[in-house]
């Protein structure tokens, strides 16, 4: 009944527009105005006809579209978020690996530099600890006037011969050096041996096999010659000395000549006296 009344109310105003101008046909309009929705719909009839179904369709379809789109949006955001997190984690891993590699390289370089420094320090210690026998000896720039240059001394601690530059004299005598320098030396040891020593020994060795008489004659001749040479008052020429030396050598070498000289008559006064005149020497 309500729908029929609505249809009748919609048809009547369009067909009975002149009746509205006349007064008697206005009862139907009043009846239609009694319904609360008809008047509002009649005033907004074009809006109701055009927008009401679309509004209803939108109201009915909008929750469905919203319901379909709502579950899709969190999934897309979640997947993108996961992808972003994975990318960040991958970048973090790459950065961590690069940082770790750099740390390892720096640690290796530091260890290598430490090893080189330790090796250099060990070499320095070995060089300084190597035994040096003469480095610790203080060498004076001015040589000592009492000690000889280049003199060697035996060191009992080093078991070797070292130079005596700045070292005290060793208590053990050196087997290589025969003579040692002394400050106070006796003048007797400095006297040179006699030149007639070898000749005297030779004559003594040869006279061991000769008779006693021959030995006495030779000694008398030698003693007289030495006394004559040592006497500063007698001047003897070089010719006579050469003749005496030759006669003495011939007398020592040949026993016959010696016997002739010893058998010659000599006065006891001349034999006892240590001096022989120059004339007799020249005659001989």
From Swiss-Prot:
Its main location: nucleus. Interacts with PPP2CA and PPP2R1A. Interacts (via its N-terminus) with PPP2R2A; the interaction is direct and this interaction inhibits PP2A activity. The CHEK1-mediated Ser-34 phosphorylated form interacts with 14-3-3 proteins. There is a cross-link at residue 86 (Glycyl lysine isopeptide (Lys-Gly) (interchain with G-Cter in SUMO1)). It is found in: Nucleus; Cytoplasm. Acts as an inhibitor of serine/threonine-protein phosphatase 2A (PP2A) activity. Inhibits PP2A activity by blocking the substrate binding site on PPP2R2A and the active site of PPP2CA. Potentiates ubiquitin-mediated proteasomal degradation of serine/threonine-protein phosphatase 2A catalytic subunit alpha (PPP2CA). Inhibits PP2A-mediated dephosphorylation of WEE1, promoting ubiquitin-mediated proteolysis of WEE1, thereby releasing G2/M checkpoint. Keywords: Cytoplasm, Isopeptide bond, Nucleus, Phosphoprotein, Protein phosphatase inhibitor, Ubl conjugation. This is P2R1A-PPP2R2A-interacting phosphatase regulator 1. Residues 175-185, 243-254 have a biased composition (Low complexity). The modification Phosphothreonine is found at residue 146. The modification Phosphoserine is found at residues 32, 34, 42, 45, 59, 73, 140, 144, 184, 186, 264, 267, 273. Residues 20-29 have a biased composition (Gly residues). GO terms for biological process: mitotic G2/M transition checkpoint; positive regulation of cell growth; positive regulation of proteasomal ubiquitin-dependent protein catabolic process. InterPro entries: PBIR1/2/3 (IPR026716). Belongs to the FAM122 family. CHEK1-mediated phosphorylation at Ser-34 negatively regulates its ability to inhibit serine/threonine-protein phosphatase 2A (PP2A) activity. Phosphorylation leads to its release from the PP2A complex and its sequestration by 14-3-3 proteins in the cytoplasm resulting in its inability to translocate to the nucleus, where it otherwise inhibits PP2A. Residues 1-65, 164-185, 233-284 are annotated as: Disordered. It comes from the Eukaryota. One of its GO terms (cellular component) is nucleus. One of its GO terms (molecular function) is protein serine/threonine phosphatase inhibitor activity. Residues 256-267 have a biased composition (Polar residues).
């Amino acid at each position: 009944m309500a729908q029929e009344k609505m249809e009748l109310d919609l048809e009547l105003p369009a067909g009975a527009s002149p009746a509205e101008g006349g007064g008697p046909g206005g009862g139907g309009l009043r009846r239609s105005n009694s319904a609360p929705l008809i008047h509002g719909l009649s005033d907004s009839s074009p809006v109701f006809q055009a927008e009401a179904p679309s509004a209803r369709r939108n109201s009915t379809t909008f929750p469905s579209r919203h319901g379909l789109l709502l579950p899709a949006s969190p999934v897309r955001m979640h997947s993108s978020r996961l992808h972003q997190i994975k990318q960040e984690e991958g970048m973090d891993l790459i950065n961590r690996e690069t940082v770790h590699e750099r740390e390892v390289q720096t640690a290796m370089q530091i260890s290598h530099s430490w090893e080189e420094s330790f090796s250099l320090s060990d070499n320095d210690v070995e060089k300084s600890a190597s035994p040096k026998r003469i480095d610790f000896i203080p060498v004076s720039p001015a040589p000592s006037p009492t000690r000889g240059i280049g003199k060697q001394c035996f060191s009992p601690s080093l078991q070797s011969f070292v130079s005596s530059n700045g070292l005290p004299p060793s208590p053990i005598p050196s087997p290589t050096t025969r003579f040692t320098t002394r400050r106070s030396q006796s003048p007797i040891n400095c006297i040179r041996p006699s030149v007639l020593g070898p000749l005297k020994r030779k004559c003594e060795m040869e006279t061991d096999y000769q008779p006693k008489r021959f030995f006495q004659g030779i000694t008398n001749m030698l003693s007289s010659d030495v006394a004559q040479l040592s006497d500063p008052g007698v001047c003897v020429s070089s010719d006579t000395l050469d003749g005496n030396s030759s006669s003495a050598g011939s007398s020592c070498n040949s026993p016959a000549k010696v016997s002739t000289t010893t058998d010659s008559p000599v006065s006891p006064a001349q034999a006892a006296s240590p001096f022989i005149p120059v004339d007799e020497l020249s005659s001989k």
